[in-house]
Amino acid sequence: MSLLGGMWKSTKPSRSKSPKPSSNPLRSSGLNSGMSSRLNSKSSLRSGHSRSSNTGRSSRQKSISGSLGSNPISSSRLNSKTLLSSIFMCKYLYPPWINNFGNFGRVEPPPLIEKNLKKSKKIKIKIHPWTGFPYNQVLSEKAKKYKKIRG
């Protein structure tokens, strides 16, 4: 314990002497800054960055975070562009009866198909909910009897 205390006392006055302004601060700061710049230049040469390695790293991080989509405005613009392009691709690649976006400048299907569609719309086949067969008078009478028995 006494040895440690003695060492502490011997190192303490040397520390208090060094930060005095009269001990040529230009020279000491020049040496320190020279050493730090040498260290920075060595590390920057190894990693392939510019001389001021700290600013290079921060700008690189900013560019990476920007490309990842941290800005919601740019990412939404990208999404809307891709959505619009997919709509236009659907419009011009597929025929208009597959496409839900309308037929701009496309030839409509032939009129025979339209007539057949109109006929099929007019004819409605009613299917009975219990039997699963189409309605007839006989089936409907049987269904009425069945309904009376069950109900």
Swiss-Prot record:
Region (Disordered) residue ranges read 1-77
What UniProt keywords apply to this chain's record, in alphabetical order? Plasmid
Q: Quote the biased-composition stretches of kind Low complexity, using this chain's numbering.
A: 19-54, 63-76
Q: What is this protein called?
A: Uncharacterized protein MTBMA_p00030
Native source organism of the sequence: Methanothermobacter marburgensis (strain ATCC BAA-927 / DSM 2133 / JCM 14651 / NBRC 100331 / OCM 82 / Marburg)
Q: What is the lineage of its organism?
A: Archaea, Methanobacteriati, Methanobacteriota, Methanomada group, Methanobacteria
